[in-house]
Amino acid sequence: MSETLLPGSGFDTYEEQDKVLVGMSGGVDSSVAVRILQQQGFAVTGAVIRFSPAHDAAVEAAQKAAKQMEIECIVLDAQELFEQEVVAPFCADYCAGRTPNPCVRCNPAVKFTALLAAADKLGIQYIATGHYARVEVDGDGVSRIHLPESAARDQSYMLSRLDQDVLSRLILPLGEFEKDDVREMARDFGLDCADAPDSMEICFIPDGDYPAFIEARGLAGKAGHFISPDGADLGPHQGVLHYTVGQRKGLGIALGEPVFIREICENGDIRLARGGEEYFTTVTVAGLVTPDGAALPAGEYLVKVRSAAPAQPAVFDGTDTLTFASPVRAPAPGQTAAFYRGGAVAGSGFITHAE
């Protein structure tokens, strides 16, 4: 393939005019990914996924971007699967006092499942997205998600549950770039989306009001009481779906000192803590997966307990327990714990408990 702007590793292994299906949203990241792949000599087809009625604007934007770049953009309808695998569990988690991460669930269960199925149907070998991460093949032939060049835009956490079926066919063209570089490339390419705003965090709830979204579905979180740091009953709260571990604002409580949510109990009570008491050393996880499907070995890892949190050293016991070298803030049940070793994702599990 021709020498062009992408400095990423592994591109010399592809053949001229290899076909790639690019997941598009109409935003700057996926659009620049298309242009980079075109410059690398790939035959690019776009695909936009309709996850819910809230995605109609994204479908229109992706089709507009594809038209400008003179590529076909197919529309994949994943609404039923998205409801089953993402929306319903999201609502159930909040109603039970857990804090879900819908993107981490969606990527393996819906987004990349839909892209692979479409690629297979079209006879396309590779898939690609505009995520900020890298895919590299280790010495054992296992493809793994690696940290991107841009620590500020790192999305490896969101991709931490992908398996070999996806990883062995996945190309991530933006892994070597900073966001500002991507926007500058979009301007150089003359793309209309160059200055488009970044996508929202919860794509199926445009206004971000997830309690209202859940309640509109006829659901309610467990009722219970606030319990003070000293064990006193402070009266009822609004229902657990309105709260998350580590939260300080919006509690509606005045104790004369800052307090945080330390624990959302199974009975619906919410235990509060003074500043500094929302840190934990031991975290239990479930649903562990690894890139190669093998069991995650016991040992030392760097672990992220939230997407934006820095990875922290921890020892995994080989079963379900992490012990951090230093306390980590507010590891919330329902969130993902992403394990890293050597700059690569080694595994991923869901937090069930912290102490």
Name each model feature, range by range:
Residues M1-S160, I171, D180-D181, I261:
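ATP-dependent adenylation/nucleotidyltransferase module used to activate substrates
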Residues T13-Q17, A128-V135, G139-E355:
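AMP-forming adenylation/ATP pyrophosphatase catalytic core
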